[in-house]
Amino acid sequence: MSAPVLLVHGWGSSFQRTWVSTGVSALLEDAGRTVIGVDLLGHGRAPKPHDPEAYRDLTARVVDALPDDGPVDAVGFSLGALTLLELACRAPERVGRLVLAGIGANVLDRDAAGIQRIVAGVRGLAPESDVQAHAFRHYAEQAGNDPDALV
Protein backbone atom coordinates (compact mmCIF):
# COMPACT_ATOMS: atom_id res chain seq x y z
CA MET A 1 0.00 0.00 0.00
CA SER A 2 1.29 3.45 -0.90
CA ALA A 3 1.96 6.13 1.68
CA PRO A 4 -0.59 8.94 1.99
CA VAL A 5 0.22 12.14 0.12
CA LEU A 6 0.39 15.37 2.10
CA LEU A 7 -0.36 18.48 0.01
CA VAL A 8 0.69 21.90 1.33
CA HIS A 9 -0.19 25.13 -0.50
CA GLY A 10 1.82 28.33 -0.83
CA TRP A 11 1.45 31.77 0.73
CA GLY A 12 -1.91 33.42 0.14
CA SER A 13 -3.58 30.25 -1.08
CA SER A 14 -5.31 27.27 0.52
CA PHE A 15 -5.61 23.50 0.16
CA GLN A 16 -8.89 24.00 -1.73
CA ARG A 17 -7.51 26.60 -4.14
CA THR A 18 -4.16 24.96 -4.88
CA TRP A 19 -4.91 21.25 -4.81
CA VAL A 20 -8.67 20.62 -4.98
CA SER A 21 -9.91 23.18 -7.53
CA THR A 22 -7.04 22.30 -9.88
CA GLY A 23 -7.87 18.59 -9.80
CA VAL A 24 -4.55 17.48 -8.31
CA SER A 25 -6.18 15.99 -5.21
CA ALA A 26 -8.71 14.05 -7.30
CA LEU A 27 -5.99 12.68 -9.60
CA LEU A 28 -4.08 11.35 -6.62
CA GLU A 29 -7.22 9.79 -5.14
CA ASP A 30 -8.08 8.24 -8.53
CA ALA A 31 -4.61 6.68 -8.47
CA GLY A 32 -5.43 5.06 -5.14
CA ARG A 33 -3.58 7.50 -2.90
CA THR A 34 -4.96 8.87 0.35
CA VAL A 35 -4.68 12.66 0.32
CA ILE A 36 -4.01 14.72 3.43
CA GLY A 37 -4.70 18.40 2.91
CA VAL A 38 -3.65 21.07 5.34
CA ASP A 39 -4.24 24.80 5.41
CA LEU A 40 -1.28 26.68 6.83
CA LEU A 41 -2.03 29.02 9.71
CA GLY A 42 -3.64 32.21 8.41
CA HIS A 43 -4.88 30.53 5.23
CA GLY A 44 -8.06 28.85 4.03
CA ARG A 45 -9.96 27.20 6.89
CA ALA A 46 -7.12 27.49 9.41
CA PRO A 47 -7.24 29.99 12.27
CA LYS A 48 -6.10 33.49 11.26
CA PRO A 49 -4.44 35.11 14.26
CA HIS A 50 -3.04 38.61 13.91
CA ASP A 51 -0.24 37.97 16.41
CA PRO A 52 3.04 37.41 14.51
CA GLU A 53 4.27 35.08 17.28
CA ALA A 54 1.56 32.59 16.32
CA TYR A 55 3.30 32.05 12.97
CA ARG A 56 6.72 31.27 14.40
CA ASP A 57 6.29 27.51 13.82
CA LEU A 58 4.17 26.77 10.74
CA THR A 59 5.64 23.29 10.61
CA ALA A 60 3.93 22.29 13.88
CA ARG A 61 0.49 22.56 12.23
CA VAL A 62 1.67 20.29 9.43
CA VAL A 63 3.06 17.76 11.92
CA ASP A 64 -0.33 17.72 13.67
CA ALA A 65 -1.97 16.63 10.39
CA LEU A 66 0.33 13.62 9.91
CA PRO A 67 -0.85 10.09 10.62
CA ASP A 68 0.87 8.22 13.44
CA ASP A 69 1.40 5.03 11.46
CA GLY A 70 4.25 5.86 9.13
CA PRO A 71 5.75 8.35 6.72
CA VAL A 72 3.90 10.36 4.10
CA ASP A 73 4.90 11.40 0.64
CA ALA A 74 4.60 15.19 0.51
CA VAL A 75 4.15 17.87 -2.13
CA GLY A 76 4.50 21.55 -1.34
CA PHE A 77 4.43 24.76 -3.32
CA SER A 78 6.24 27.97 -2.33
CA LEU A 79 5.69 28.55 1.41
CA GLY A 80 4.31 25.01 1.59
CA ALA A 81 7.52 23.68 0.07
CA LEU A 82 9.65 25.62 2.55
CA THR A 83 7.50 24.28 5.39
CA LEU A 84 7.90 20.70 4.13
CA LEU A 85 11.64 21.17 3.79
CA GLU A 86 11.75 22.16 7.46
CA LEU A 87 9.58 19.14 8.33
CA ALA A 88 11.94 16.80 6.47
CA CYS A 89 14.93 18.25 8.34
CA ARG A 90 13.23 18.09 11.75
CA ALA A 91 11.62 14.68 11.37
CA PRO A 92 13.04 12.79 8.37
CA GLU A 93 11.37 9.57 9.53
CA ARG A 94 7.95 11.19 8.90
CA VAL A 95 8.62 11.89 5.20
CA GLY A 96 9.08 9.43 2.35
CA ARG A 97 9.17 11.15 -1.02
CA LEU A 98 9.29 14.92 -1.14
CA VAL A 99 8.35 17.25 -4.01
CA LEU A 100 9.25 20.91 -3.49
CA ALA A 101 8.10 23.43 -6.10
CA GLY A 102 8.09 27.19 -6.45
CA ILE A 103 10.85 28.05 -4.00
CA GLY A 104 13.73 29.01 -6.26
CA ALA A 105 16.57 30.94 -4.68
CA ASN A 106 14.37 31.87 -1.69
CA VAL A 107 15.37 28.65 0.00
CA LEU A 108 18.92 29.95 0.44
CA ASP A 109 18.77 33.70 -0.10
CA ARG A 110 15.88 35.71 1.32
CA ASP A 111 14.79 38.69 -0.75
CA ALA A 112 14.05 41.17 2.05
CA ALA A 113 13.19 43.99 -0.37
CA GLY A 114 10.79 41.75 -2.27
CA ILE A 115 9.12 40.67 0.96
CA GLN A 116 8.65 44.30 2.05
CA ARG A 117 7.16 45.10 -1.36
CA ILE A 118 4.63 42.27 -0.96
CA VAL A 119 3.75 43.42 2.57
CA ALA A 120 3.20 46.97 1.32
CA GLY A 121 0.94 45.67 -1.44
CA VAL A 122 -1.10 43.49 0.90
CA ARG A 123 -1.53 46.40 3.32
CA GLY A 124 -2.52 48.75 0.48
CA LEU A 125 0.57 50.91 1.00
CA ALA A 126 2.42 50.25 -2.27
CA PRO A 127 2.56 52.97 -4.92
CA GLU A 128 -0.31 52.74 -7.41
CA SER A 129 2.27 52.14 -10.13
CA ASP A 130 3.36 48.87 -8.46
CA VAL A 131 0.64 46.66 -9.91
CA GLN A 132 2.46 43.48 -8.96
CA ALA A 133 2.59 44.45 -5.27
CA HIS A 134 -1.13 45.26 -5.27
CA ALA A 135 -1.88 41.93 -6.94
CA PHE A 136 -0.68 40.13 -3.81
CA ARG A 137 -3.59 41.52 -1.75
CA HIS A 138 -6.07 40.45 -4.41
CA TYR A 139 -4.42 37.02 -4.58
CA ALA A 140 -4.60 36.58 -0.80
CA GLU A 141 -8.26 37.61 -0.68
CA GLN A 142 -9.22 35.14 -3.40
CA ALA A 143 -8.57 32.12 -1.17
CA GLY A 144 -10.85 33.40 1.60
CA ASN A 145 -7.91 34.50 3.70
CA ASP A 146 -7.56 37.47 6.01
CA PRO A 147 -4.74 39.39 4.28
CA ASP A 148 -3.93 41.29 7.47
CA ALA A 149 -3.26 37.97 9.21
CA LEU A 150 -0.79 37.02 6.47
CA VAL A 151 1.53 39.99 6.97
Spans of features found by a protein language model:
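The conserved beta1-alpha1 loop
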Residues: L6-G10
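Gly/Ala-rich beta-loop-alpha elbow adjacent to hydrolase catalytic centers
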Residues: G76-L84
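Short beta-strand immediately N-terminal to the catalytic nucleophile in serine-hydrolase-like folds
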Residues: A74-G76, A101
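Hydrophobic, aromatic-rich cap/lid helix
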Residues: R137-V151
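Active-site loop/oxyanion-hole signature of alpha/beta-hydrolase fold enzymes
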Residues: V20, D30, T34-D73
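The serine-hydrolase catalytic nucleophile loop
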Residues: G12-S25
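Flexible "cap/lid" loop of the alpha/beta hydrolase fold
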Residues: L85-R90, V95-A126
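Alpha/beta-hydrolase active-site loop signature
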Residues: G12, L40-G44, A105
